[in-house]
């Protein structure tokens, strides 16, 4: 569940009660006020009393932006504060709460909210994000302090429990939280959770929270293992989504090359107002799109699993602060299990084909003997689900996802908390697939089939995907410029861009980390949307002449100027002055005297 200040609006607020009615610790109440909340949301007003007063386990299903994070953090913090009052100050209690999330990005996000809530009680409640980017020696030192609350991914926690015995004391554990539980299972953490259960004091009074935007049958196994007569909270979000989440969904049937052409026209002419999140299906596609956009002077930044964790978090933070208007995110997560209820039984073999497609190379060419960029990807990276992207006006599926469920996760980054948003998806018809090899993506072969499933899925929710209408003649006028710019972005240029970007981000992430901690203001000057320039940039492509613009957008004609290939001033400067300097450097002053 993502956290967003003042993003939860009317439909989710329960103004019939206040946080004071829960009889919380004064320090916790003050922290909640500092964050900016006066009334709890519906899920908070139901879950907090059940957890605090009745000590019930909680299984909750609620939409993104409904306040699930505070629904479990507040009871955890309040109970630990009460427990601290009953023990001696010098008594070691070990870890009291564990919060498990599917990705590193979500772990950092939850940890940031946790830090704000324990602002006035940090002496009593120490926190640690074990999935953050730190060395093993530093992590071991921090674990020696026995933090009361630990946030991390199941894989990282299991690794610590197995390899660093006694580094985490779970004898007095009181809380286990699994956030975005369906995604945790989808990422293949089922076995990790079972193994973690062997280290937990399940026979004691361990209180469990299982939180998610969707609940399915796979959660039953976790329910039986970790929960005791849980309270199951399900909120009917269909009416809320219809009335409040005004998400406009469009699709465009377009050829592979025309994806780049449409992107150029849309962003160069500012047809989308506000911040845009673009999803691509692999890392190379992200860099190709960025480099093509650079040809036309369109700035963007990249977010993918190769970048260091610190850089990824900084990119998300700056995007939320409106430093960037265009973010290209790689969503190359391989789902372990397909969970689309809408898919017919007869298409099971197709699902297997689609999953295998995600791992196939972009082209059908034989592997090159040339040395390729070999960078270790972060298995705990995830961007299409849970990450807190604020005020996203549009989600553009440059590459259509390989499952209908993944589509829901992507478009869920916009139209959150009752705000409006737009989702546009590029779909490659089967007859157009493979016609333009340089821009081809293997997963596009299944686009039409996936689109039909998405339409069917959304129709069950009362939502509709409409074809995106635009003037084809106006777009065709830009085609020759796109062909010119696209030709300059070669595979070699993409490889060089990836290497250059990694070097820049590693430098900023590792060597400057301590410097930026001491000088936080200088961190603001670190930008991630700088031009990479590994391709030949043609400056004349960065401006759009008036004759290409629609009549309504044209000026009075005085702004249109010819852009020469050579600098006229430099060419004529040699003609000025008839007297040239002799080779020996000596000049007769009398001959030049006037």
Swiss-Prot record:
Residues 49-233 form the Helicase ATP-binding domain. Residues 567-584 have a biased composition (Basic residues). Residues 246-476 form the Helicase C-terminal domain. GO terms for cellular component: nucleolus. InterPro entries: DEAD/DEAH_box_helicase_dom (IPR011545), DEAD_box_RNA_helicase (IPR050079), Helicase_ATP-bd (IPR014001), Helicase_C-like (IPR001650), P-loop_NTPase (IPR027417), RNA_helicase_DEAD_Q_motif (IPR014014). It holds the Pfam family Helicase_C. GO terms for biological process: maturation of LSU-rRNA from tricistronic rRNA transcript (SSU-rRNA, 5.8S rRNA, LSU-rRNA). Its EC number is 3.6.4.13. Disulfide bonds: none annotated. GO terms for molecular function: ATP binding; ATP hydrolysis activity; DNA helicase activity; DNA/RNA helicase activity; mRNA binding; RNA helicase activity. It comes from the Eukaryota. It is an enzyme of class 3 (hydrolase). This is ATP-dependent RNA helicase DBP9. It is found in: Nucleus, Nucleolus. CDD domains: DEADc_DDX56, SF2_C_DEAD. The Q motif is unique to and characteristic of the DEAD box family of RNA helicases and controls ATP binding and hydrolysis. The keyword Phosphoprotein does not apply. Residues 345-366, 585-594 have a biased composition (Basic and acidic residues). A motif (Q motif) lies at residues 17-45. Residues 339-377, 558-594 are annotated as: Disordered. It comes from Saccharomyces cerevisiae (strain ATCC 204508 / S288c). Belongs to the DEAD box helicase family. DDX56/DBP9 subfamily. Its main location: nucleus.
């Amino acid at each position: 569940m993502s956290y967003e200040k003042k993003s939860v609006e009317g439909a989710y607020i329960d103004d019939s009660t206040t946080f004071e009615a829960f009889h919380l610790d004064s320090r916790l109440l003050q922290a909640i006020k500092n964050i900016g909340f006066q009334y709890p949301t519906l899920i908070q007003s139901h879950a907090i009393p059940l957890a605090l007063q009745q000590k019930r386990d909680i299984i909750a299903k609620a939409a993104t932006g409904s306040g699930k994070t505070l629904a479990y953090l507040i009871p955890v913090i309040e109970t630990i504060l009460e427990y601290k009052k009953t023990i001696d100050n010098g008594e070691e209690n070990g870890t009291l709460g564990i919060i498990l999330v599917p990705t590193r990005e979500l772990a950092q996000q939850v940890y940031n909210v946790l830090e704000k809530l324990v602002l006035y009680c940090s002496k009593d409640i120490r926190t640690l994000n074990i999935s953050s980017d730190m060395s093993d020696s530093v992590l071991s030192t921090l674990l020696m302090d026995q933090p009361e609350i630990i946030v991390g991914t199941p894989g990282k926690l299991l690794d610590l429990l197995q390899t660093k015995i006694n580094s985490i004391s779970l004898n007095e554990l009181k809380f286990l939280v699994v956030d975005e539980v369906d995604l945790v299972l989808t990422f293949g953490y089922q076995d990790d959770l079972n193994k973690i259960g062997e280290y937990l004091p399940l026979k004691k009074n361990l209180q469990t929270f299982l939180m998610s935007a969707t609940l399915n049958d796979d959660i039953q196994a976790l329910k039986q293992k970790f929960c005791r007569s849980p309270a199951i909270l399900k909120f009917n979000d269909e009416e809320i989504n219809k009335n409040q989440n005004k998400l406009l969904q469009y699709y465009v049937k377009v050829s592979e090359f025309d994806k780049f052409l449409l992107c150029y026209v849309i962003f160069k002419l500012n047809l989308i107002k506000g911040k845009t999140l673009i999803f691509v299906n692999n890392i190379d596609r992200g860099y190709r799109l960025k480099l093509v956009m650079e040809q036309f002077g369109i700035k963007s930044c990249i977010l993918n699993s190769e970048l260091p964790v610190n850089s990824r978090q900084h990119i998300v933070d700056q995007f939320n602060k409106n430093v960037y208007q265009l973010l290209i995110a790689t969503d190359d997560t391989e789902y372990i299990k397909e969970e689309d209820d809408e898919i017919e039984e007869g298409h099971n073999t197709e699902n297997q084909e689609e999953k295998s497609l995600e791992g196939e190379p972009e082209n059908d060419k034989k592997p090159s003997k040339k040395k390729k960029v070999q960078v270790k990807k972060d298995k705990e990276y995830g961007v299409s689900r849970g990450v807190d992207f604020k005020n996203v006006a549009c989600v553009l599926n440059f590459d259509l996802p390989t499952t209908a469920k993944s589509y829901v996760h992507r478009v869920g980054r916009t139209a959150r908390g009752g705000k409006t948003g737009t989702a546009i998806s590029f779909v490659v018809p089967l007859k157009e697939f493979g016609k333009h090899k340089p821009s081809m993506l293997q997963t596009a072969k299944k686009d039409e089939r996936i689109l039909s499933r998405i339409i069917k899925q959304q129709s069950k929710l009362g939502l509709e995907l409409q074809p995106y209408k635009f003037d084809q003649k106006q777009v065709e006028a830009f085609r020759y410029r796109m062909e010119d710019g696209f030709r300059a972005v070669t595979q070699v240029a993409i490889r060089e861009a990836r290497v250059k970007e990694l070097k820049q981000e590693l430098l900023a992430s590792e060597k400057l980390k301590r410097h930026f901690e001491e000088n936080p203001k200088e961190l603001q000057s670190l930008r991630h949307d700088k031009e990479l320039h590994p391709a030949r940039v043609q400056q004349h492509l960065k401006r759009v002449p008036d004759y290409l613009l629609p009549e309504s957008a044209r000026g009075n004609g005085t702004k249109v100027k010819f852009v020469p290939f050579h600098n006229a001033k430099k060419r004529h400067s040699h003609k000025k002055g008839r007297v040239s300097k002799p080779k020996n450097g000596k000049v007769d002053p009398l001959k030049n005297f006037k």
